[in-house]
From Swiss-Prot:
Subunit structure: Part of the 30S ribosomal subunit.
Name of this protein: Small ribosomal subunit protein bS18c
Gene source species: Rhodomonas salina (Cryptomonas salina)
Cellular component annotations (GO), alphabetically ordered: chloroplast; mitochondrial small ribosomal subunit
Compartments in which it is found: Plastid, Chloroplast
PROSITE patterns given in the database record: RIBOSOMAL_S18
């Protein structure tokens, strides 16, 4: 039976996830601007929901693009 080690979360528990922190949020987006799933990011359910809401809020305020056609963030 294989034993899998859980990947460490890139965000520490208790750290604030803010929609204005574009540099942090861009780590959870693909080159096309899509939100990465939690199985790839290593976030918990609660953290993934907060990151998703922060990304969507940043998109509405034009801090992040909805679709990235240039291929770079």
């Amino acid at each position: 039976m294989a034993i899998y080690r859980r990947k460490a979360s890139p965000i520490k528990i208790g750290d604030a996830i803010d929609y204005k922190d574009v540099e942090l949020l861009s780590n959870f987006l693909t080159e096309q601007g899509k939100i990465l799933p939690k199985r790839l990011t290593g976030l918990t359910n609660k953290q993934q929901n907060k990151v998703t809401k922060a990304i969507k809020r940043a998109r509405m305020l034009s801090l992040l693009p909805f679709v990235n056609r240039e291929g770079s963030l």
